[in-house]
Amino acid sequence: MSRIGKLPVNLPAGVTVEVLAGNVVKVKGPLGELSQKVDADITVTVEGTTGKLTRPTDQPRHRSLHGLYRALINNMVVGVSAGYTIRQELVGVGYRVDVQGQLLILSLGFSHEVQIMLPAEIKAEAEPVKKGQNPVLCLKSADKQLIGHVAAKVRSLRKPEPYKGKGIKFVGEQLRRKAGKSAGAK
């Protein structure tokens, strides 16, 4: 058995999971509704407050799909019940973030401001900047895949560089720093 796939998916209060035609799993909860098409070989059953996935054989393909879809469904359950939050810190002189509805406006040292239109499922807010601290962008959503994709897209605008650490980084992310060229000259 797959170590991940054999675990049951626990459903918190207020979360319902239903399997629709075409093997589409629909998860509803207080924070929204998500759906995921599951491979035809994987069977999804819901019994009370737990969901269970089974596979027909122990072929490597079935084993990998078993764990994959169990993890995806569990991420959907956590998303509609608790939600996901990603915080990103903008490190650099003059780096700023402004949120106007679903429009994200970033000042990242370019000659122009960068504007990103966020999907409707994602809510963004710029945390108030205290003196001496870097601006922080907070993204919230029920969809883990979508929020991760958007956060990676924002980070790719200015990846942190290894010498001074300037760029957009996730809060708590440890960057590999390098010594400058003066470190080797002795």
Language-model segment annotations:
Residues 2-66, 70-186:
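N-terminal intrinsically disordered, cationic/polar leader segments
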